[in-house]
Design a protein with these regions (language model features):
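Exposed extracellular interaction/assembly regions and N-terminal maturation sites
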Residues: 23-103, 116-118, 124-146
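Serine/threonine-rich low-complexity intrinsically disordered regions
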Residues: 1, 9, 110-112, 129
Length: 146
């Protein structure tokens, strides 16, 4: 099918269904039995200033080997949620944050320094600027996952 498709009522699909382009859903999407939804994870290793592209993924992973700065993400959408996984390598890595990241109490968290420590920043985009970069991103970090 290479054009607009509208399904009214109940629709079922067996096998693999790939949708590209804009997709709109009205009503409910229900996953049953052994179904699962997975979100693409993007590696961002080896970059000191990281501007995540929120248009290609919601979840991100990086190994922190030096001083990294989380810059303003591009292609953000209001209401978008996700996680940024940070893995400490050697204990010398550090994270700083662009001012668009808003943490509880107004204080950015300190990144765990134990070798192999995993920290997770969960976020929701509260507002964006006119160029679709994140303007206010509410974030919280949990640390020291083993």
């Amino acid at each position: 099918l290479l054009s607009t498709v509208t399904a009214t009522g109940n629709a079922g699909f067996l096998g693999t269904v790939r949708v590209s382009g804009n997709t709109s859903l009205e009503g409910q999407l229900q996953l049953t039995e052994s179904a699962a939804a997975a979100v693409h994870t993007t590696a961002i290793n080896g970059v000191t200033s990281v501007s995540l592209n929120f248009g290609i993924a919601q979840n991100f992973l990086t190994t922190v080997t030096a001083a990294h700065t989380l810059a303003r993400p591009t292609n953000a959408r209001v209401g978008q949620v996700g996680s940024i996984f940070l893995v400490q390598s050697g204990g010398s890595g550090a994270i700083s944050y662009n001012g668009c990241f808003k943490f509880p109490g107004g204080t950015a968290p300190t990144f765990a320094t134990s070798n192999g420590a995993v920290s997770r920043i969960d976020y929701i985009v509260a507002s964006i600027s006119s160029d679709n970069t994140g303007e206010n991103i509410h974030a919280i970090m949990t640390q020291e996952y083993a």
